[in-house]
Amino acid sequence: KSGILANYSKKNLLVNNDLFSLDLILGDNLRYNLNYFVDNGFYISYGLRSSYNHFRANSKFKPIVSQNPNVSKINLQYTDITNQIFFQTTFSRKFALGAGLEQKHIEATTETVQINNVETVFDNSNYYNVFGYLKLDTYDQKYFVTKGFLADLNFKWYVSSSDYNNNFKSFAQAKGTIGFAATFWDKLTFQTTHEAGFTLN
C-alpha cells in the first residue's frame, strides 16, 4: 500500500490563541486527522477533533470462517469516523485535565460472503460517548529524557448506540501510561514506562 501525506497547520486562524492542523493521507486507504484547539492557558481551553480512517484487509474473522469451511479469510472493509469536542484546563503548564463528548461511526462489511448477492454487514452503528483524561509531564526533555515523571490516563464511557446488531450494552474503558526517569552518577539514566487498561461493563 502507498500513500501521500499532506499537512497544513495554522496559528491564529480564528482567534489570537488558536491552532488548526490537518493531516491528510491520500492513497489506497484514505485517512485524515483534523485538530482545532483554543489555548486559554490557565483558564478553560477548548477544541475539537475529527478523524476518518478507512482500510481493506484480509482477516481470519472467526465468526465467518468457522461457519464457512470453504473460506479461510475474508476481505474486510472497515470505516471509522470520529468527532470530538472537549474542554481542558492546565496547571503549571505540566498538568492537564480534560473532558468531552464523542460521536463515532463504525462500518465493517465484507463481500467475501454474500447472502442473495448482498454483502455481509458486521456493524453500521453510531456510538455516543463521553471521555476524560489526565496528563502530567515533568520530563526535562522530549526525546533524551534524564529525569521526571509522565502520566497519561484516559477514560471513555460508551453511553449509547444506534445499535445495528441490537446487542449493544453500555460499557467503559480505562487505559493509561505511566513513566519515570532518573539519572545516577551524572551519566547513567534509568527510564521505565508501563501501560495498562481494562474494560468495565
Annotate each PLM feature.
Residues 1, 127-201:
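C-terminal outer-membrane beta-barrel translocator/porin domains of Gram-negative envelope proteins
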